[in-house]
Amino acid sequence: MSTPAFSLRNPENHARCAKPLRKRKLSPPQIDTPRSFSPSRQKRAKTTKILGQSLPVHRIIETLDRNALQSLLQQVAAANPQVAQSIVDLAPKPDTKDALAVMRAKFDAITAHLPYKCSAESDYSYTRVKPYLCEFLSTLSDFILNMLPPLEVDLQPACTILDAITEMIHKLPNFSNSEFQYTRAMAYDQLSTSWQILLDAADERLLVRVEAEMGLSRRLQKHNELSGGKLTQAVESAGRGQSPLLGGLITVDYSSFRH
């Protein structure tokens, strides 16, 4: 039996035919990198997602000035009647000083917008200040209604405010415009009615006290003169504070009295 030409047992043939093996070099991509350092295998830390949000209402209010806050409240109240009623229910009652400050500011806006180069009583002057005059009269109406019975039970603050309102009507520029003359006459009529309602509803003892502290009858007599007699009925209503209870406050001279 012949031996195969390429028998592994023939070292001479094996040495002649076999090619020497070369040691393979590992290329860089084939080099194993520890998994802990592999960028593709690293786990990114989870971060909490934070979204922007609007300021709370109380923070928004803190940033607003007086005018901006007033404008905002008026817009909200106009759009939401229930909110408007909540404001009425929750807002503190304005005191006499604050109420008068608002009305005087409205009055000052009229005089501040009078033109310089023409008569303050001209039609042009009236047309220019008419929007401010209407706002002033509207403001007076709101405050007058707020201090009449049964809302107002304290007579003296109400009389103080109504006295100041009457004084401001006297001081309005006497525009020659017929529309203004009619408006002013109506204002005096409404003031007279308001005085009567306020004084007729007052207890006589309270009226006596206000008369003693304010000299109400004297003030109304002066207002009546300046209005051209349009407050006569108000003067008569105030007269209840002089008789009969006021008689106890009058000093009587008994020096000539004979027993």
UniProtKB/Swiss-Prot annotation:
Pfam annotation, one family: Cut8
Localization terms from the record: Cytoplasm; Nucleus
Superkingdom to which the source organism belongs: Eukaryota
GO CC entries: cytoplasm; nuclear membrane
GO biological process: nuclear protein quality control by the ubiquitin-proteasome system; proteasome localization; protein transport
GO molecular function: proteasome binding
Stretches for region Disordered: 1-46
InterPro entries in UniProt: Cut8/Sts1_fam, Cut8/Sts1_sf
Basic residues composition bias: residue spans: 16-26
Keyword Transport: yes
Main location per the UniProt record: cytoplasm
Keyword terms: Cytoplasm, Nucleus, Protein transport, Transport
Family membership: Belongs to the cut8/STS1 family.
PANTHER family, sorted: FI02826P
Task performed by this protein: Involved in ubiquitin-mediated protein degradation. Regulatory factor in the ubiquitin/proteasome pathway that controls the turnover of proteasome substrates. Targets proteasomes to the nucleus and facilitates the degradation of nuclear proteins.
Complexes and interactors: Binds the proteasome.
Protein name: Tethering factor for nuclear proteasome STS1
Native species: Clavispora lusitaniae (strain ATCC 42720) (Yeast)
Lineage: Eukaryota, Fungi, Dikarya, Ascomycota, Saccharomycotina
